[in-house]
Every structure is written in C-alpha cells, then in structure tokens.
Amino acid sequence: MKTIIYSPGDPAGIGPDLFLSLLNEDFFRLIKANVVCLGDKNLFESRASELGYDLTFDFFSNIDDLQDKIGYLEILKCPDVSSGILNSVNSEYVINNLDYGIDSCLQNKNTGLVTGPISKENLVEGGYIFSGHTERI
C-alpha cells in the first residue's frame, strides 16, 4: 500500500490546522493510502482542542507499524507548541520532520511527501540555511 507523509511545517502556522481539519472531516478515509503526519503529540492534541475537534490520535514510533491507518509519527518533541507565534526554537523540529519525510520518500518509491508552510525567515533565525522546500528536496 502507498503511504503519504505530511510534514506540517511550522508548528505556529496553519499546517497542523490543515491536517486536523481534514482529519475532522474524515477526508483521509477516502484516500487509498496510509497517511502519516509527522509531529509532536502535544502539538496536535493541544491544537485539536483549540480548534474544538474531538479527535483520537494514533501515534507510532515506526512508520512500518502503520498498516491501513491514519497515524502520527513523533520524530522530535516540539519545544513551543503555541499557535500563531513564530519561535525560532522550533527550527530543528521543523527541519527534522521535513528531512525525515524526504528520506522516507528516497528509501521507498511507494511513499509521497506533502509539505506544510514553513517560515524561511524563522528557520534562518534558528541557524539553518534554508531557501525553500524545493531546494532542500
């Protein structure tokens, strides 16, 4: 079965909200693929609460454990899960999620990557050289 990995981008932005909104609308049940969202458990639980969504989360420690499901894979803890406030302390979290998604696609031809919005300025402020998703991929 094919797998779609979603790297939600900056935790302060709309990326996590987009995924949660689609999950809340049961959109992913229509897709004939495993769907994996990369991210911190606390981030998604707190954001779902902010949005008023009553969702159940399945977190996995290994992408290979996901079979015919929608799940979350926590690569790294997010230092600041505040919505709407950019914080460069999250730069490593954002880059690690993106790089994990890229590496997974390179290792498995049945895996696709969808990326959420990233603040380039915030990543540079966090110490990373980053000019965009396309260049990094």
Protein language model regions, located:
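Contiguous, glycine/small-aliphatic-enriched amphipathic segments in soluble metabolic enzymes
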Residues: 1-136
